[in-house]
């Protein structure tokens, strides 16, 4: 980013070889973790996670995805970018050059069969 004093740069390092954290290892209080697990077992709904950069949003979301992942489910994500790949989950990178936006990806997902 250009500033009056010169360029400002931030570098984000992702360690692709690291294992995705288990929900138990994220430091939630036991009761909070149990509530999260209960919500994740529901057949539908929305869980919204927000926070500043570096607060653990992606780590929490990837842990949740791993928790619900099984062969009976068709889990699809739309990400910008896909930070970590999870076997068994269909992860889609947003690609504006190919006109693959979040909106178009979501519309395509909604047209798919369940499995």
Give the predicted meaning of each segment:
Residues 1-55, 60:
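N-terminal "pre-motor" subdomain/linker immediately upstream of P-loop NTPase catalytic cores
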Residues 35-47, 53, 58-115:
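Switch/coupling sub-region of P-loop NTPases
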């Amino acid at each position: 980013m250009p500033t009056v004093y010169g360029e400002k740069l931030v570098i984000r390092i992702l360690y692709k070889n690291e294992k995705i954290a288990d929900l138990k290892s994220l430091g939630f209080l036991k009761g909070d973790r149990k509530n999260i697990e209960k919500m994740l077992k529901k057949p539908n709904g929305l869980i919204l996670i927000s926070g500043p950069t570096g607060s653990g949003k992606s780590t929490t979301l990837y842990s949740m995805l791993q928790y619900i992942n099984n062969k009976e489910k068709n889990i699809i994500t739309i990400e910008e970018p896909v930070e970590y790949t999870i076997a068994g989950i269909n992860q889609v990178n947003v690609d504006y050059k190919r006109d693959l936006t979040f909106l178009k990806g979501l519309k395509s997902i909604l047209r798919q069969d369940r499995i």
